[in-house]
Amino acid sequence: MISKNQFDEEIQNVVEQLIRLYKPEKIILFGSLAKGEIKEETDIDLFIIKSDVPEFGADRIRQLDALIKYRLATDFIVYRPEELEHRLKLGDPFVKNILEEGKVLYGAG
């Protein structure tokens, strides 16, 4: 099983690359790692806010996969600020949970 130290190092590695190469407005760690829980199936879940991204989600992920090098299983969710605002107005429980329980790694709190 992967140790907390290994996850912490990989999170730092990925976040540094994101800041340097992808230039997001905000990065939030969510899921089990944000809660400090490590299980066999744990991966790194990152919620990213960025204004200038492709229209479709799959294109956003392809863009990230081409830029960012990572060693551990990492999932990215990318929203434009206006998409985030819209999801919150709709009361999206998934997004609300990320913002309430996630850990801001980069950007204003």
Where do the protein language model's features map onto the residues?
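P-loop (Walker A) phosphate-binding loop of NTP-binding proteins
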Residues: 32
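Catalytic core of pol beta-like nucleotidyltransferases
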Residues: 1-26, 35-40, 50-109
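Short beta-strand->loop micro-motif that forms the acidic, two-metal-ion catalytic signature
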Residues: 45-49
